Amino acid sequence: MAAAGAGPGQEAGAGPGPGAVANATGAEEGEMKPVAAGAAAPPGEGISAAPTVEPSSGEAEGGEANLVDVSGGLETESSNGKDTLEGAGDTSEVMDTQAGSVDEENGRQLGEVELQCGICTKWFTADTFGIDTSSCLPFMTNYSFHCNVCHHSGNTYFLRKQANLKEMCLSALANLTWQSRTQDEHPKTMFSKDKDIIPFIDKYWECMTTRQRPGKMTWPNNIVKTMSKERDVFLVKEHPDPGSKDPEEDYPKFGLLDQDLSNIGPAYDNQKQSSAVSTSGNLNGGIAAGSSGKGRGAKRKQQDGGTTGTTKKARSDPLFSAQRLPPHGYPLEHPFNKDGYRYILAEPDPHAPDPEKLELDCWAGKPIPGDLYRACLYERVLLALHDRAPQLKISDDRLTVVGEKGYSMVRASHGVRKGAWYFEITVDEMPPDTAARLGWSQPLGNLQAPLGYDKFSYSWRSKKGTKFHQSIGKHYSSGYGQGDVLGFYINLPEDTETAKSLPDTYKDKALIKFKSYLYFEEKDFVDKAEKSLKQTPHSEIIFYKNGVNQGVAYKDIFEGVYFPAISLYKSCTVSINFGPCFKYPPKDLTYRPMSDMGWGAVVEHTLADVLYHVETEVDGRRSPPWEP
């Protein structure tokens, strides 16, 4: 059994070696500063109106000249053969086949070659109409397709077009994302330029575009420029997190901003606002009719050739400029909570009065007032990317964490202040000489130390089942290891001061800009907080092992907001399940899954923000009366 009082980052009794991990940060010191106020062309309709190309004994009859005039050079396919129509420049493929049956239910089959009709906007699999898909890929967008019901000839119409680099990158990332979802235990959302994206495009070049493969290998550099520029579609991460074991040569990594692959489709100019294709993220390469034109793509030309009418004032508005977040709801590059400071991602508060006052000359060059912003919350409970030791590696889905060297900790994105709550952790890998301490922590718990090191956290250790609080270890149960599923229950009374309080609005805090995002900066007063801690009667923490209640671990714990927390020693790997479905749901008590705190926190913070504006004089920048 380890000696009580082990130091930060150090497994008790294991020696000081691996524990000496210096604090790291994802920010360069000079990059944080106070913030001062201050479509691809659609396919031509002339093609669809051309005389129909009827299947014949290997020849394209009638309408050949018209197709050549419009497209410049097309390949015509039929069920009996393939002929090449000679023309200049771009080569494309067109097909008219006898109709199969229209998919009445319009069901999607992601991962298959699907085609969207440019008139009715319904989706069909290519096999429905017997279309040759040997030169096609799933999630392609460089085509024009009319189903047999919509096309004037009564036949299906399919034209494969030349793809630009943006469309090729979009298709490649969509296919890589789908493959990872279906094949990997922990799906990835970001992919290496050299190891994933370039090899995929090189392998499937002929399937992705009708353009000839270039003789010079300059296109890999061009796709990097394309994805780095198209930030309304692609995510870019140029370097690994500080302390990460990811090799630098795997970067830059790219991913899709919108992870809903069903949004990917061709940019038809007659697409209706009520169509099945979502305009989220502009993944279809254009802005659908009826779109408001908001977001980063708003400055580009609309489908009718005009501009969005965005004024100079709107472009320079620092408050409501679009702030696009990755699929998991947090910027890829961000400041870490460290050195006595905490950072809360901010977004414009739509309920703030008079946001246009920033346009007044008197505000030029001055910091943006914090009451015009609010804490940016994600509706899912996940592991926090910023509220962790930088050396810990978090998976793309933010549900798995891998340890590194000495003990260090990560907290969840949401905490609880009252009621009974539960979550599970599965030990995926626990090699010899590794360990874990799992449990609950308040926001001020030391991230560069094992859970249970200070007064703000309570933990259960894998070795010998020891429980820890204030670095004092006591026997609790048998230990746990690889393959075990552990449950964590907490019950906090409803009548405490913390339980009756609304969450902090942070509106009286300074706004800090880092990598194009704004954050509230909050100073930690650990010593003052420790002295003000008081025990909460009738509160308790219980741990479970493979569905078996191990007994009450702690009673009358300190009052505060508690977050699910994980601390790992060396290369241990665990996955967390916030619910609502658990492998071993407790049957001996009532609880709510931690996943319920996702929307619960949104409601609480919204109420706090609205009350702030109602009860506080905005120009005075005074804290709400319920805050100390």
Swiss-Prot record:
The modification Asymmetric dimethylarginine is found at residue 296. Coiled coil: none annotated. A zinc finger (PHD-type) spans 1-66. Residues 36-65 have a biased composition (Low complexity). Residues 1-107, 235-331 are annotated as: Disordered. Its main location: nucleus. A zinc finger (C4-type) spans 117-150. The modification Phosphoserine is found at residues 101, 316. Pfam families: ASH2L-like_WH, PHD_ash2p_like, SPRY. Residues 270-282 have a biased composition (Polar residues). Residues 67-177 are annotated as: DNA-binding. Residues 360-583 form the B30.2/SPRY domain. SUPFAM superfamilies: Concanavalin A-like lectins/glucanases. The keyword NAD does not apply. GO terms for molecular function: beta-catenin binding; transcription cis-regulatory region binding; zinc ion binding. One of its GO terms (cellular component) is MLL1 complex. Residues 1-18, 283-295 have a biased composition (Gly residues). One of its GO terms (biological process) is positive regulation of cell population proliferation. Ubiquitously expressed. Predominantly expressed in adult heart and testis and fetal lung and liver, with barely detectable expression in adult lung, liver, kidney, prostate, and peripheral leukocytes. Transcriptional regulator. Component or associated component of some histone methyltransferase complexes which regulates transcription through recruitment of those complexes to gene promoters. Component of the Set1/Ash2 histone methyltransferase (HMT) complex, a complex that specifically methylates 'Lys-4' of histone H3, but not if the neighboring 'Lys-9' residue is already methylated. As part of the MLL1/MLL complex it is involved in methylation and dimethylation at 'Lys-4' of histone H3. May play a role in hematopoiesis. PANTHER family: SET1/ASH2 HISTONE METHYLTRANSFERASE COMPLEX SUBUNIT ASH2, SET1_ASH2 HISTONE METHYLTRANSFERASE COMPLEX SUBUNIT ASH2. Interacts with HCFC1. Core component of several methyltransferase-containing complexes including MLL1/MLL, MLL2/3 (also named ASCOM complex) and MLL4/WBP7. This is Set1/Ash2 histone methyltransferase complex subunit ASH2.
